Each structure stands twice: as structure tokens, then as C-alpha cells.
């Protein structure tokens, strides 16, 4: 492993709706037994007895590591929370199909012990830093500009590092990181880009004129989107979170922050294998042995014992 520093204070980030109390209490008990303080956002204080409630800014500033309890959406929220001061983030899988989360609840005890001991590999993730007037947003997957029904379309001119590239007229425009290329961008017809390659993917959805194919640009590039006079009112979303509207005359700027996220990997080879299988869910069918790989470890063991 990479010999990361020990974690002395860990933050818990919880799925916003699902009941994760049982697993959260296990984290608190295991961490406290090793003399490690557990922080939680004040809005979640009632869900985690024994954790220290703090404001979001304090949590991001004080934590040496984060444990995310949920799916990929919760994991993305945890990464955004500490993007200004990146610390290792461990994802515990309590949601739906996910590419970022790695650990199942049955593996929590050993996974948390390794996190606290610094016995893990870090997987760096780039983020998009988005500016639209006075608004600021961070996205680890993607930025989307989407039309409202009956209120016009996306009509925007793209400049790359200050040089005009072309224009878009479409229903939605998605700017994705390489890691986020398997999400909204892929659904809109964009390519899958390996995070090890890096890059920014710009994909129009339902293009009518202008640039009609996806673009793959360098992470060193900065993007400027000028919304033209014929542009409709658009929803601005970062990782699926709404950040209000933009419209004609507005300018949206996007730059990449490299290594803005530090994702904990305990067994990178196994995670990569599972991720490849999960990607195949986007284009069914799956082989039975591939479906078996997606099951939690304890379920696979029971199935193998029965078949043996």
C-alpha cells in the first residue's frame, strides 16, 4: 500500500434519505475504540448517536478522512464537501449500482481499520470548477445545461482556452470528467473515457445544429460557454444538483482541478474488475458469472456453498 498517514479524526457523510443508522453506529464504535473521534454534519446529528456534530465547513477543515455511507451520489457529495482540502474518502456501499463505492457493510470492520491505519491506495479524481456570474460549483462527474420544456433550447458558443471552437444548439449540453463519462454524458451518446487517461468530454444531447458530436479535450484546457441571444432559460446542474438558471448573455466557465478527490481503494484490481462488470450493465446482456461478481461477498459465499 502507499503508506498514507494515519487518520486521527474521521467524518461521516450519510445518504440523505435512507436509514444508515446501524452502519453509522458501527463506524462510531469501531473508531472510538481506537481513540478516533467521529464528526458528523449538524443536520445529521440525530442520526448518529456518539458522533460530534459540527458545521459543514468545520467538518471539511478538521477531518483527516471521510466515510461515505450510501451510493455514488452520497460519495460524490462527500468528495465535493472536502474538495477545498482533499482528504481520503472511503465509500461504503448502501445504495444502488455504483462505480465509486467499494466496500460492502460486511467488510466494514477491516476496511475501517485499514483506513485509520493508512493502509490503502489513493485513487485521484479530477473535478470541474464551474463559474457562472457570482455562482460557484464543483462537479466530480459532470456539469449539465438543460432546457426547460417550452422555454427554448441550449444555444451556446464554445471557446477552448480563449479560442472560439464552435456553437451548439441542442436540448442539453453535458461537460464531464473522465470518471463522469459513464454517467449523463454516456447516456447522451458520449464516449467512455478511462480516468487514467483523463480529459474533459463535451456532449450535446439531441443536437439540432452546430457541433453534433462529442468532443474530448485536455484537462489543461479551460472552457467558456457564451449563451447566445436565442438561448432559452437553462437549468444549471453540477453532479445532478441544481444551481439555478442561466440564460442569454450569461457566461459559464469550466476549469479542471486535478486530484480534487482522494478515493480510498483497498484492492484496486478487484474494484477495477467489478467496475468493468458494472459497465456492462449499460449494454446488456450479462453472463451469469458476471452477475455473481456484483453480489456482496457474503451472498456469493452462500451461493458457492450451496452449489458445492
State each model region's role.
Residues 1-65, 69, 106-121, 132-136:
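ATP/NTP phosphate-donor binding region
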Residues 15, 67, 71, 93, ...:
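A residue-level signal for conserved active-site and pocket-lining positions in enzyme catalytic cores
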Residues 20-23, 73-79, 127, 182-186:
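Short glycine/serine/threonine-rich phosphate/pyrophosphate-binding segments
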Residues 26-31, 83-84, 189-193, 219, ...:
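Short, solvent-exposed amphipathic alpha-helical segments in soluble enzyme
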Residues 37, 86-88:
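Proline-centered loop/turn at the N-terminus of a beta-strand
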Residues 95-172:
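Catalytic core of DAGKc-family lipid kinases
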Residues 137, 145, 161-164, 213-308:
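ATP/nucleoside-binding phosphotransfer catalytic cores, i.e., glycine-rich phosphate-binding loops
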Residues 153, 163, 167-211:
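Gly/Ser/Thr-rich active-site loops/lids in small-molecule metabolic enzymes
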